[in-house]
Amino acid sequence: MEERRLFKPSIEYTEQIAEYKAEFSPEQIRATYDPDRIPGMDYLENYNSIPEWLCFLDTVKGKITWHMSVWMSDGKIIGFCCLRHKLEYDDDDPDFASNVGYSIRPSERRKGYAKEQLRLVLQEAKRLGMDHVRIICRDINIGSNRTILANGGKFVDAIYGEESGMTVHRYDVPIS
């Protein structure tokens, strides 16, 4: 497996970010808790352009950190992730709050990249002084459930969202 690193999204990656986003169909997003968002790219749907979204990212520095996981050999974006420094920042029902959101480009799935990307995000959380993170995923998202468990996630519970009609699994992941 080639080396991947996390990079902060920037204007230089505008075209690659657009290509990444375009690869997601409604069917692929439906497996997530919020079917209007691509995980790890929160709030992109609220902006008319990627540069506008990048400006938004600057406004939440210190609360949320976004990263792209990138192939070092060719600069291809294989994943996006965000690390929410505090659960109370989440604007949804607090029971459904999550410190981490992530996605892998559909054409690059089932290759172990999500596991590696989450490992890198946990290193970033440790650097920020966090001792654990809470992560949620839909009960039907087998890949995400496995990724979280592979990174030391401890199953907390399954909760049903009355408004969304979805069941999610909640995990706590200790950071060592």
Task: List each language-model region with its residue ranges.
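GNAT-family acyltransferases
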Residues: 1-99, 106, 164-176
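Loop/helix-junction capping segments adjacent to catalytic residues or to phosphate/diphosphate-binding pockets
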Residues: 14, 111, 142
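Short secondary-structure boundary/hinge segments and terminal tails
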Residues: 126, 143, 166-167
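Conserved beta-strand-loop-alpha-helix junction that forms the acyl-donor binding cleft
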Residues: 135-145
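Conserved acetyl-CoA-binding loop-helix of GNAT-fold acetyltransferases
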Residues: 102-104, 110-123, 127, 146-150
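Conserved GNAT acetyl-CoA-binding A-motif
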Residues: 125-136
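Conserved catalytic-core motifs of GNAT/GCN5-like acyltransferases
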Residues: 136-137, 152-170
